[in-house]
């Protein structure tokens, strides 16, 4: 049964402001890729790579993420950019690397950032969309996002989604890795995956875990490494002592 999306109140975000004037044209303004502006094959390839970067949040397009059939259809203008984004989001690779390793609440936040170019307004919106995932499944959730009025007004059929009105803070691709905290701690990728080497220093959870200077807990490992020499009481019974052998004798 398709339940209607629960009502939630939008909060103030930069993308809801029509213009910031000259501040819109700073170095943080992303380049907007449009299929209408692609007149050559190389320019169409740039649009395709931009779609991969936006959906998979990877700086380098990996070979096993590519969807050759969808690429061919987009190059020949058989499908739109919106359809290409939809195909990438519904691909098996995206499901295995993003959907399967996150709970519904974090999945909503990740998809809002990558498909609508904004973060979730509040917890109410996350709950509303997570219910949509529970009733329609993830593919139905993707259709609901890409067919929404917000997506149509912001990007239409031929514009690659991008982070809208980023005036400060870090790009979404750095704050929404495909693993969540729970999954990273569970499988132990936090210490071995290179993507989190720098990321962990900005995580609130990691900052709270860092101990201040002078905290005795910082020297716990040092104290455990010290192996003091211990002296134990002599374990010898009186019945085991040969007293006669110890009596001095004149020779």
From Swiss-Prot:
In terms of InterPro entries, this protein maps to: PBS_linker_dom, PBS_linker_sf, Phycobilisome
Segments forming domain PBS-linker? 11-191
Spans through the membrane: none
BP GO terms, sorted: photosynthesis
Q: Where's it found, cell-wise?
A: Cellular thylakoid membrane
Q: Does the keyword Membrane apply?
A: yes
Primary location class: membrane
A single cellular component GO annotation: phycobilisome
Described purpose of this protein according to its UniProt entry:
Rod-core linker protein required for attachment of phycocyanin to allophycocyanin in cores of phycobilisomes.
What is the name of this protein? Phycobilisome rod-core linker polypeptide CpcG4
Native organism: Thermosynechococcus vestitus (strain NIES-2133 / IAM M-273 / BP-1)
| Gene symbol of the encoding locus | cpcG4
């Amino acid at each position: 049964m398709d339940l209607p999306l629960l009502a939630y109140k939008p909060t103030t975000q930069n993308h809801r402001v029509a213009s910031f004037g000259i501040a819109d044209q700073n170095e943080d303004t992303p380049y907007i890729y449009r299929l209408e502006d692609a007149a050559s094959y190389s320019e169409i390839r740039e649009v395709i790579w931009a779609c991969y970067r936006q959906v998979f949040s990877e700086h380098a397009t990996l070979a096993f993420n590519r969807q050759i059939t969808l690429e061919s259809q987009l190059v020949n203008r058989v499908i739109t950019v919106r359809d290409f984004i939809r195909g990438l989001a519904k691909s098996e690779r995206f499901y295995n690397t993003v959907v399967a390793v996150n709970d519904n609440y974090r999945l909503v936040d990740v998809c809002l950032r990558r498909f609508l170019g904004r973060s979730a307004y509040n917890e109410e919106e996350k709950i509303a969309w997570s219910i949509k995932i529970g009733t329609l499944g993830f593919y139905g959730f993707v259709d609901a996002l890409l067919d929404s009025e917000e997506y149509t007004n912001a990007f239409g059929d031929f514009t690659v989604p991008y982070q809208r009105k980023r005036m400060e803070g870090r790009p979404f691709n750095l704050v929404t890795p495909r693993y969540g905290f729970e999954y990273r701690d569970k499988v132990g990728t936090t210490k071995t995956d290179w993507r989190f080497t720098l990321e962990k220093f900005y995580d609130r959870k990691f900052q709270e875990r860092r101990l201040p200077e002078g905290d005795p807990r910082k020297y716990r490992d040092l104290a455990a490494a010290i192996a003091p020499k211990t002296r134990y009481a002599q374990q010898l019974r009186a019945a085991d002592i040969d007293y006669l052998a110890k009596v001095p004798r004149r020779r």
